[in-house]
Amino acid sequence: MQRLLTYRALNFILFIASVVAMLFAIIFLQNYKGLEPCPLCIFQRIGLMVMGGFSLIAAVGHPKKMGMQLLLWIGSMAGILWSAGVAARHVWIQHLPADQVPACGPGLDYFLEALPMKQVINQVLSGSGECAEISWRFLGLSIPEQALILFTALILVNLLVLWRIISKRTA
């Protein structure tokens, strides 16, 4: 059990979890089920990839200095907190009464071409009608609800990484 909780192993777990989640989204949800990701789903994936990237660098690079470990941890945690925040917003939009659901707007491609990045982020986080649609459920949970559970678990693993960084220095 002790070997499973090393700094390197925990970062590999985070990286593998991000790869598995992305493969599930792309292969199963998009290709097999034919579900296209809404802008909020895409934003969640971006945060997941950020977390996975920083975790891979931490696992492979295995830095010895606490400062570098903390920097990589901050990057990883920022990515997954972003994903969790966007997923929470997505769940909230899906639970709005029908008369309060934002109207459908242009897609993310249009926003990226026509607007500055700050406005793109504001528009996407405002949500749209397509983000309120629940197109698939598993165990009674929508995709954003499942994602929020996953992201919460990954936040907990990230906190274990922080614990490993700090506990090595205080021991």
Swiss-Prot record:
Q: For side Cytoplasmic, which residue ranges? A: 1-10, 64-70, 165-171
Per the UniProt topology annotation, the Periplasmic ranges are 28-46, 89-145
Quick one: where is this thing mainly located?
membrane
The regions listed as transmembrane in this protein's record are 11-27, 47-63, 71-88, 146-164
What InterPro entries does its record include?
DiS_bond_form_DsbB/BdbC (IPR003752), Disulphide_bond_form_DsbB (IPR022920), DsbB (IPR050183), DsbB-like_sf (IPR023380)
* Domain of life where this protein originates: Bacteria
Tell where it localizes: Cell inner membrane
Q: Which GO terms describe its biological process?
A: protein folding
Name any GO cellular component annotation.
plasma membrane
Q: Which GO molecular function, any one, fits this protein according to its record?
A: electron transfer activity
- How does this protein sit in the membrane? Multi-pass membrane protein
Q: Does the keyword Transmembrane apply?
A: yes
Q: Which Pfam families match?
A: DsbB
Q: List the disulfide bonds.
A: C38-C41, C104-C131
| Keywords, comma-separated and alphabetical | Cell inner membrane, Cell membrane, Chaperone, Disulfide bond, Electron transport, Membrane, Oxidoreductase, Redox-active center, Transmembrane, Transmembrane helix, Transport
Q: HAMAP family attached here?
A: DsbB
Instruction: State the protein's purpose.
Output: Required for disulfide bond formation in some periplasmic proteins. Acts by oxidizing the DsbA protein.
- UniProt family annotation: Belongs to the DsbB family.
For this entry, the protein name equals Disulfide bond formation protein B
Q: Which organism is it from?
A: Psychrobacter sp. (strain PRwf-1)
Q: What is the organism lineage in this UniProt record?
A: Bacteria, Pseudomonadati, Pseudomonadota, Gammaproteobacteria, Moraxellales
